[in-house]
């Protein structure tokens, strides 16, 4: 049986950690940082874990 191709868009947006979690970048990080509190800017800079509802479909896109 042939291997599944990895979805090009998904491989640019998600990464799998060593423990198996799927992480993604947070939104709203392009401009207008002077309007936001420092704490919200700092919070946005951290990666977030993908929700459990989306985990299965994203793993499929990544070919895992």
Curated annotation (Swiss-Prot):
PANTHER family: 54S RIBOSOMAL PROTEIN BL35M (PTHR33343), LARGE RIBOSOMAL SUBUNIT PROTEIN BL35M (PTHR33343:SF1). It comes from Beutenbergia cavernae (strain ATCC BAA-8 / DSM 12333 / CCUG 43141 / JCM 11478 / NBRC 16432 / NCIMB 13614 / HKI 0122). This is Large ribosomal subunit protein bL35. The lineage of its organism: Bacteria, Bacillati, Actinomycetota, Actinomycetes, Micrococcales. NCBIfam families: rpmI_bact (TIGR00001). GO terms for molecular function: structural constituent of ribosome. GO terms for biological process: translation. InterPro entries: Ribosomal_bL35, Ribosomal_bL35-like, Ribosomal_bL35_sf. Belongs to the bacterial ribosomal protein bL35 family. One of its GO terms (cellular component) is cytosolic large ribosomal subunit. Residues 1-64 are annotated as: Disordered. Keywords: Ribonucleoprotein, Ribosomal protein. The keyword Zinc does not apply.
């Amino acid at each position: 049986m042939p291997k599944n191709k990895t979805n090009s868009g998904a491989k640019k947006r998600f990464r799998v950690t060593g423990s198996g979690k799927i992480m993604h970048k947070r939104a709203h990080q392009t401009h207008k940082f002077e309007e936001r509190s420092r704490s919200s800017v700092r919070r946005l800079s951290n990666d977030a874990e993908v929700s459990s509802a989306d985990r299965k479909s994203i793993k499929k896109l990544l070919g895992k």
